[in-house]
Amino acid sequence: MRNWELSVSPSFLELCDQYVSLCESPSFSGPSCLNDMAPDDILGNCDLFAEAADALFPDCLLEEVEAASGLAFETNEEVEGFVFPDCPERPGQECRSCKQHREMSGDPSILCSLCYMRLTACFVYSPVSDVEDEEPTEGVAENSLKRQADSSLCSSSPKRFC
């Protein structure tokens, strides 16, 4: 086996040292605030490129692309089919979201999540442990929903959740 030895001339090493010293960033002695970093006439500099940008991308071209891609707000099928939640005075009555859920499921007593939350609880969270003086509930009875909805604490605060 032969061993090869590469010898580098000192002038090459000096050039490398000079290059590294040029590439190193100098110590920071920056401006006192962010506004001093940008030139005052930055808007004037942007105006120089405005005509070129308009020539490259005219408004009529952008409108054609938007119409062809179906990204326009009016033609977006996902937005048209979406029912935005209501916040009726009486949860479950005259609520578009509840109506949509009832039509889709065929169950006339079903509620949307917002109306269900407003009927069954005053707050979004649930307690960590059960209250000892309440009777255990295996299922949610209809009269307990009405009783909770008629309580003074819940009836004074449903507007907070809308």
Curated annotation (Swiss-Prot):
Highest taxon of the lineage: Viruses
Keywords attached to this entry: Early protein
Keyword Translocase appears in the UniProt entry: no
GO-annotated biological processes: regulation of DNA-templated transcription; symbiont-mediated perturbation of host process
Keyword set includes Protein biosynthesis: no
Stretches the record annotates as Disordered: 134-162
Compositionally skewed regions (Polar residues) per UniProt: 150-162
Native organism: Tree shrew adenovirus serotype 1 (TSAdV-1)
Protein name: Early E1A 18 kDa protein
Transmembrane segments: none
